[in-house]
Amino acid sequence: MTLKINLGCGWRNFGPDWIHIDGGDYDHLDHKDIINFPYENIDLIYASHVLEYFDRDEIVPILKTWKSKLKPGGILRLAVPDFNNLYAIYQRTGRIDKILGPLYGKMPMGDKTIYHKTVYDHNSLVALLESLGFRAIQTWDWRTVEHGKYDDHSQAYYPHMDKENGIPVSLNVEAHNGL
């Protein structure tokens, strides 16, 4: 059996083939945290627009924990706001309000509000993953993955929902554990 985790799933339910983990309060959640999963047990961890809620000092131990839970060769699939494309959107429009959401996003989480603390471009995200021992790092297309039918921020575009001609807001990268 393939063990797939939707980490930071929020209100998105990918169905019974996935384990849903989030710190929020949603009916479909299976767990609140990944910490109690056995080491080297998970085939795929998908985290869409989660990393940006942690600052650069916090993210290394978090990614190390996630990596420790992946089987050898297991996949960490990430989606984060793409700084290069946000900059391109700003250059095209001259309107900062068009990028404030993905750049400084906020979300209610229980009795508090959490905010984006950092941003990545392709080079910085790849360098971070390589420094932690991830290999075979590549971009992924939401149209070709098993969860592509579930619309989440990995499919965000400017103009909104212009998936044919728009600029992708999300940087989608996946990496293998130690290949």
Show where each model-derived region lies.
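Conserved class I S-adenosyl-L-methionine
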Residues: 3-10
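Adenosine-cofactor binding site in Rossmann-like domains, unifying the SAM/SAH pocket
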Residues: 11-39, 47, 141-142, 147-163
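Residues at the starts of beta-strands that form the adenosine-phosphate
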Residues: 3, 17, 136
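S-adenosyl-L-methionine-dependent methyltransferase catalytic module, highlighting the catalytic core
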Residues: 56-65, 69-71, 75-178
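Structural motif
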Residues: 3, 43-44
